[in-house]
């Protein structure tokens, strides 16, 4: 059995998957913030419960936001302060007496989708998350590409390209990102960025779901906004796809529920790609909230 943990600032979610990659059991508990030992106990207790339930010693994989293992072997995860700065992988491996694998949660999302029965035919899969932020991951031949700093797929921290400024106007404000840089595309293409763009052009403060509801009702202002957003997304993706050249692009995060993104993006991309480039197949993520657990469990399928 394969145990996949999706760990975030508020919850620890465990999913148990069988050899056919089907979910057999899941459980969620709050993420402890009081101490590192309490955090370790929470993970180990879930593993012990799963071992007892299934009568096996399951393989453990963990997806967590941040850098799973820095040069000195410690975790960097600002959203999980009880474990950040600690040698999480080594400590869990010792306590659980088994190999524990860690990766960035966005890489786990991409891995989950790449191992979907419908998508395993594609050798190079790009996962793109359009949610609270913008991120993603790359999977080549069923294995995540992590890089030495675990930042492969941090697409949200690419800067706005020149074509974006041509589209939006050269007086378009370059916003300072939480990473400290100016003009990161996350500030415009995330769910919050989607809402910020609307406020910038129309001086109305609405959340993304409210704007999308107006679009569905045929509101002309919302329609113009969505057209502008999709054009900006295509411009930014043009740079990324030219570098990555994936066979499949899977889009997740809250904005992936907006069907216009997956249905209208393909037609906008060719003018931002090389003439010989092929537009990848574009699909909405299949596994929703279970994607993080799936991808973490499947870290043991990448040998």
Swiss-Prot record:
GO aspect biological process, one term: peptidoglycan turnover
Catalytic reaction(s) noted: N-acetyl-D-glucosamine + ATP = N-acetyl-D-glucosamine 6-phosphate + ADP + H(+)
SUPFAM superfamilies documented for this protein: Actin-like ATPase domain
One annotated GO molecular function: N-acetylglucosamine kinase activity
Cross-referenced Pfam families: ROK
Positions of Zn(2+) binding: 157, 177, 179, 184
InterPro entries in UniProt: ATPase_NBD, N-acetyl-D-glucosamine_kinase, ROK, ROK_cs
Family: Belongs to the ROK (NagC/XylR) family. NagK subfamily.
Function, in words: Catalyzes the phosphorylation of N-acetyl-D-glucosamine (GlcNAc) derived from cell-wall degradation, yielding GlcNAc-6-P.
Protein name in the entry: N-acetyl-D-glucosamine kinase
Gene: nagK
